[in-house]
A protein has these predicted regions:
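N-terminally biased helix-coil "hinge/interface" segments that flank
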Residues: 5, 123-124, 179
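Hydrophobic alpha-helical scaffolding
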Residues: 21-25, 29, 43-51, 63, ...
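Short, hydrophobic alpha-helical segments
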Residues: 39, 172-179
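Residue-level recognition of short, structured coil/turn motifs
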Residues: 40-47, 127, 155
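FAD cofactor-binding and catalytic pocket of flavoenzymes
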Residues: 47-72
């Protein structure tokens, strides 16, 4: 059988003739780093200290979590695997939500929405449904708001991967399965 592949969803081989369906964004967590750089540049230009603002961003995002009519951010800074010319956009801006809090929450929501849209392609093509999320990466590990957005959007409980070096661990497990 040929595994499902469509619209940027790839079937990557596992051991024993199995496949894993992968929807991989080109920007992912880097979108949050771009946002942090934006705010940091502003702070420095305004005479503030040049230091990481991730803790501040977490507070801003938390403050906007239940905002009515939130800012919508598409985090396609580098396009997609199928169309690298696509770019980011910010929509649904009003005078009430065009705030640092609203933009920060919008970026986090947009990061997960890109992944959710990929999941929807897989679901529509295969019938596979999410029953539980296992998340990896420092962006997810260090940001409870991002975890909550993920769980809410996918409608499933979320756990963090047990090991922090996820790629190396996955390669080791895959190699061990081949024997």
């Amino acid at each position: 059988d040929k595994p499902f592949e469509e619209g940027g969803i790839e079937a990557r081989p596992l051991a024993r003739g199995k496949y894993i369906l992968v929807g991989a964004s080109l920007c992912g967590g880097r979108a949050y780093a771009v946002l942090e750089k934006f705010f940091r540049t502003f702070v420095v230009q305004a005479g503030g200290e040049d230091k990481a603002l991730y803790e501040v961003l977490k507070k801003l995002a938390r403050a906007a979590m239940n905002q009515e009519n939130p800012v919508e951010v598409s985090t396609l800074f580098n396009g997609t695997r199928t169309d690298p010319t696509l770019r980011d956009s910010i929509t649904n801006i009003s005078e009430n939500n065009f705030t640092p809090e609203g933009i920060t929450y919008g970026v986090l929501h947009g990061m997960i929405k890109e992944l959710y849209d990929m999941y929807q392609q897989i679901h529509q093509g295969t019938g596979i449904q999410v029953s539980h999320l296992v998340a990896s990466g420092n962006g997810m590990r260090k940001n409870k708001v991002l975890q909550e957005i993920s769980s809410e959007m996918f409608g499933a409980d979320l756990s963090l991967a047990v090991y922090q070096e996820e790629a190396a661990c996955g390669a080791a497990v895959s190699s061990a399965m081949a024997f």
